[in-house]
Curated annotation (Swiss-Prot):
It comes from the Bacteria. Homodimer. Within each dimer, one monomer is responsible for RNA recognition and catalysis, while the other monomer binds to the replacement base PreQ1. It catalyses: 7-aminomethyl-7-carbaguanine + guanosine(34) in tRNA = 7-aminomethyl-7-carbaguanosine(34) in tRNA + guanine. Coiled coil: none annotated. Zn(2+) binds at C306, C308, C311, H337. Its EC number is 2.4.2.29. Substrate binds at D94, S95, G96, G97, F98, D148, Q191, G218. Keywords: Glycosyltransferase, Metal-binding, Queuosine biosynthesis, Transferase, tRNA processing, Zinc. This is Queuine tRNA-ribosyltransferase. Belongs to the queuine tRNA-ribosyltransferase family. Residues 249-255, 273-277 are annotated as: RNA binding.
Amino acid sequence: MPAVTYEHIKTCKQSGARLGIVHTPHGSFETPMFMPVGTKATVKTMSPEELRQIEAKIILGNTYHLWLQPGNDIIKQVGGLHNFMNWDGPILTDSGGFQVFSLSNLRKITEESVEFRHHTNGLKLFLSPEKSMEIQNDLGSDIMMAFDECPPMPSEYKYVKDSIERTTRWAERCLNAHKRPEDQALFGIIQGGEYKDLREQSAKELVALDFPGYAIGGLSVGEPKPVMYEMVEHTVQYMPDDKPRYLMGVGSPDALIECSIRGMDMFDCVLPTRIARNGTCMTSNGRLVIKNAKYANDFKPLDENCDCYTCKNYSRAYIRHLIKAEETFGIRLTTIHNLHFLLKLMEDIRQAIREDRLLDFKDEFFEQYGLNVENPKNF
């Protein structure tokens, strides 16, 4: 029995989206689900108690950052990430691959590993499939990700083909090096850039290795959204129905709806927390930039349709003042709101699937959010 399993509840008759439950050693969560990102063992400015209050069910930790600071050996001493950060729900850790490929300019890819320089002190480091598994086994996450290569978009066909074949070989090495399959589930990551045949090849090769779950990687890296939707739609048909499907790095409201419609179950992104730090808020009427002068004496909540802690207690004028004054409390309030907004959106998506009306919900949401106009204010 794998450490993580997927239970299918129903398929939306109108859209084909799926409602399910993912069961993990630290509890279960309904899908489709958005997962807040806690890069360095904290969702920035939020306590675990606050995450529970906004109904976050599963959070992410970042293997690359936790390996470099404080070190996986320290986290292992206390029994893993759950104890270290006092979060008793499910945790997913990424493999570190994306950071190596995005943060480090100086890198050398060989069959054995990736050689790169530390993004702050320039020290030479190596990350391999085996090392990634060792770190993630020490972190003790419920879901671990295979170490993959993330080719930039766009890349030449030949380069991407070589890359996905290496990713498959690395995936096999990850499976062999993974020491705790009974209480940690290792997911494979499908790559292939914007080439449909390579996405298909990558999916088929990884499905043959029989991981307990699968992710689509290498999207939401700057390509136009229609390209991303096309790649998801094409790839999902090669992913097993009886295992979780995770779309990495997606967190804009429109993409969460569109990719739920296309059959994905799990999503993560730093977007809601990152934009909160400069005062950009997601609301039911679209994007709101709280620093704008027009909010200086606006005493309404960020979103009159929202019942989060921020919207129930504080005004736009007050939050604008805090953000302009660079007060940490302002960032806490916008972070709470943005994460609550996305988690509530996912709840609404799940309810619409239950009622077989996700396409209707999409139309209503897009209309109110202001996405049906030319050049909408989006993320």
